[in-house]
C-alpha cells in the first residue's frame, strides 16, 4: 500500500509560471535583453532555477560573470513576486487533505531553491506536508538521488510504500531512479506525448485522478 506521496511543486501542486515569467521578464528588460513569452517560460521550468535562467537567456548566459550577475538580479525579483500570483491547481487541496485523513504522508521534493520552496509551502499549504525539500546550492538536482536519500532517511520514507508525482521528465526519472511508481500529470508544463516517452507508471489529466491512479498501481 502506498503511504508516502512525494510531490514535485511547480506544475504539479501550484501554477507558478506567471510569477516566474514576471520575474524573468523584468530581469531581461533590466539587462536590455529580449523578453520571452509565458508559454516559453513554461518550457523552461523543471530543472531548477539556474537551468531556468540559462534557458531564458538563450545562449547569452555563457559568460560566467554575466550569468551570476543576471541570476542574482532574477532571484531578488522572484523572491519578491513568488507569493503574488501562484495558484493551487484544482483538486490539489482535496488530494492532500485525503492523504492526511488516511494517516498517510505527503512530501515535496522540488528543484526550486530550498528557502523559497519552504517559504511558499508555509504560506500556501500550512501543515499538509510531512517534509519539504528544495534544491540546495552545491548539490545535484533531480533526478540525482543523493539529496533524496538523505531526505528519506530524515523523514522515515519507506520506498516500497512510496510514489513520485510530477509534471516533468526529471520527476519521472527521479521515481525510476528510486525504483518506485511514478505518476505524471499533464495539467502542468510538459506535453503528454513528452511525458509518455519517459514511461511513467500512470499518466493523469487532472489532480482529482491522482488518488485513483495510486490505487490502481499493482
What residues fall within each predicted segment?
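Asp-based, Mg2+/Mn2+-dependent phosphohydrolase catalytic module
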Residues: 1-3, 39, 100, 114, ...
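N-terminal helical cap/lid subdomain that shapes the substrate entry/recognition surface
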Residues: 2-94, 101-105, 113-118
Amino acid at each position: 500500500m502506498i503511504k508516502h506521496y512525494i510531490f514535485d511543486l511547480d506544475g504539479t501542486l501550484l501554477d507558478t509560471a506567471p510569477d516566474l515569467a514576471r520575474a524573468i521578464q523584468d530581469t531581461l528588460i533590466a539587462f536590455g535583453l529580449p523578453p520571452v513569452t509565458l508559454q516559453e517560460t513554461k518550457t523552461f521550468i523543471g530543472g531548477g532555477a539556474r537551468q531556468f535562467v540559462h534557458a531564458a537567456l538563450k545562449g547569452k548566459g555563457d559568460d560566467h560573470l554575466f550569468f551570476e550577475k543576471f541570476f542574482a538580479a532574477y532571484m531578488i525579483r522572484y523572491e519578491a513576486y513568488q507569493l503574488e500570483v501562484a495558484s493551487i491547481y484544482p483538486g490539489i487541496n482535496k488530494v492532500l487533505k485525503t492523504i492526511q485523513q488516511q494517516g498517510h504522508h505527503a512530501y515535496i521534493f522540488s528543484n526550486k531553491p530550498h528557502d523559497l520552496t519552504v517559504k511558499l509551502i508555509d504560506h500556501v499549504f500550512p501543515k499538509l506536508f510531512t517534509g519539504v525539500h528544495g534544491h540546495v546550492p552545491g548539490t545535484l538536482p533531480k533526478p540525482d538521488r543523493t539529496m533524496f536519500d538523505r531526505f528519506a532517511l530524515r523523514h522515515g520514507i519507506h520506498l516500497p510504500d512510496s510514489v513520485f508525482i510530477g509534471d516533468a521528465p526529471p520527476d519521472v526519472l527521479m521515481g525510476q531512479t528510486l525504483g518506485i511508481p511514478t505518476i505524471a500529470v499533464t495539467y502542468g508544463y510538459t506535453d503528454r506525448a513528452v511525458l509518455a516517452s519517459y514511461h511513467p507508471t500512470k499518466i493523469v489529466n487532472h489532480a482529482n485522478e491522482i488518488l485513483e491512479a495510486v490505487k490502481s498501481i499493482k
